């Protein structure tokens, strides 16, 4: 039985994106197409499936690091900034990602039943969320044709 730790994260997030795209509870809000993903960005994301991709990434991060709060996830999705994007004029300064995007996506994952709020600890994955991750990882492991992953099958 494969778990989410047995497959590469990029492929798992890609497969979860396709799975979460079919969910009714997970869809981008109206404001999402105009919102930057952090202070260090100049423009909103250009990907069509950005919202479901971020939700899939959040689901994996909560499963690996959970229970985890929004502030810790903001730090995970942040980057470093050296002044404006055009003029790199100062030393690196760590900035955080957008809390509203993370919070709203987590609330949608809660509505779908994949994440729950634990008291005073943040959010953690439910049994349904863990089984979705592990089932997706198992399907992905059989699809991937990579010799280094054969020992997990």
Curated annotation (Swiss-Prot):
Database matches in HAMAP family: Ribosomal_eS19 (MF_01474)
Coiled-coil spans in chain: none
Naturally occurring in which organism (per UniProt): Haloarcula marismortui (strain ATCC 43049 / DSM 3752 / JCM 8966 / VKM B-1809) (Halobacterium marismortui)
GO biological process, one term: translation
GO CC list: cytosolic small ribosomal subunit
Sorted UniProt keywords: Ribonucleoprotein, Ribosomal protein
Ranges of compositional bias, category Basic and acidic residues: 120-133
Family membership: Belongs to the eukaryotic ribosomal protein eS19 family.
Summary of subunit composition and partner proteins: Part of the 30S ribosomal subunit.
Chain segments carrying region Disordered: 77-99, 113-139
Classification via SUPFAM superfamilies: Winged helix' DNA-binding domain
UniProt name for this protein: Small ribosomal subunit protein eS19
InterPro entries, per the entry: Ribosomal_eS19, Ribosomal_eS19_archaeal, Ribosomal_eS19_CS, WH-like_DNA-bd_sf, WH_DNA-bd_sf
A Gene Ontology molecular function term of the record: RNA binding
Origin superkingdom: Archaea
Function: May be involved in maturation of the 30S ribosomal subunit.
């Amino acid at each position: 039985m494969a778990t989410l730790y047995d497959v590469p994260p990029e492929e798992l997030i890609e497969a979860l994106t396709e799975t979460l795209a079919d969910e009714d509870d997970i869809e981008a809000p109206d404001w999402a197409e105009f919102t930057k993903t952090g202070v260090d960005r100049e423009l909103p994301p250009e990907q069509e499936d950005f919202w479901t991709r971020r939700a899939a990434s959040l689901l994996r991060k909560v499963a690996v690091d959970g229970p985890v709060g929004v502030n810790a996830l903001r730090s995970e999705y942040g980057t470093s900034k050296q002044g404006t994007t055009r003029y790199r004029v100062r030393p690196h300064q760590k900035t955080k990602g957008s809390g509203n995007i993370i919070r709203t996506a987590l609330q949608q994952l809660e509505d779908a039943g994949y994440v729950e709020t634990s008291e005073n600890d943040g959010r953690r994955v439910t049994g349904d969320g863990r089984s979705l991750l592990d089932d997706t990882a198992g399907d992905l492991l059989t699809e991937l044709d990579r010799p280094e992953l054969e020992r997990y099958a």
